[in-house]
Curated annotation (Swiss-Prot):
Organism encoding this protein: Thermus thermophilus (strain ATCC BAA-163 / DSM 7039 / HB27)
Pathway as given in its UniProt record: Cofactor biosynthesis; pyridoxal 5'-phosphate biosynthesis
Protein name: Pyridoxal 5'-phosphate synthase subunit PdxT
Lineage, opening ranks: Bacteria, Thermotogati, Deinococcota, Deinococci, Thermales
One GO CC term, this protein: glutaminase complex
Keywords: Glutamine amidotransferase, Hydrolase, Lyase, Pyridoxal phosphate
């Protein structure tokens, strides 16, 4: 094993991210408490229900601990779907929803519709090429700060963005067999 990556395991599809990391030869550590962050250089925040993830992270003290590590530059983050919502500075229409706020972006929850309107679409990811995106009640990035780079779009809408060591995706790369986006994050994190 080359390294260990944390996967926030409070709610959502954290098991799928663990499997994606395993296929790359990376050990995944479930993170549920602040002490679970010790020694980690990278953390994946999975899809699921963004309000629940935010409330539980706040209740368990993870919100402040993760924010501090990201601001210090000692922790890289990858948020997918609900995880991307939690990373954003602003959640449109939900000003009171708990959020980490480390990604200078405003996101719109469920921007493509409800669960029954979920879909799959081929995307062009900068530096990676074609990538199959699975969109389930997916958010979209409506406003991006100057330091945020768009890596993929669906039409005109940004669906994969990066700011420093923070990567955020509207779609679910863990639900495909394609390891490239997880590998990209590992390289970004130096794992």
């Amino acid at each position: 094993m080359r390294g260990v990556v944390g996967v926030l395991a409070l709610q959502g599809d954290f098991r799928e991210h663990k499997e994606a990391l395993k296929r790359l030869g990376i050990e995944a550590k479930e993170v549920r408490k602040v002490k679970d962050l010790e020694g980690l250089k990278a953390l994946i925040v999975p899809g699921g229900e963004s309000t629940t993830i935010g409330k539980l992270a706040r209740e368990y003290g993870l919100e402040e601990a993760v924010r501090r590590r990201v601001e210090e530059g000692t922790l890289a983050l990858f948020g997918t779907c609900a995880g991307a919502i939690w990373l954003a500075r602003e959640i449109l229409g939900y000003p009171e929803q708990p959020r980490l706020g480390v990604l200078d972006a405003a996101v719109e929850r469920n921007a493509f519709g409800r669960q029954v309107e979920s879909f799959e679409e081929d995307l062009e990811v900068e530096g990676l090429g074609p990538f199959h995106g699975v969109f389930i009640r997916a958010p979209v990035f409506r406003r991006l700060g100057e330091g945020v780079e768009v890596l993929a779009r669906l039409g005109d809408l940004p669906v994969l963005v990066r700011q420093g060591k923070v990567l955020a995706s509207s779609f679910h790369p863990e639900l495909t067999e394609d390891p490239r986006l997880h590998r990209y994050f590992l390289e970004l994190a130096g794992v």
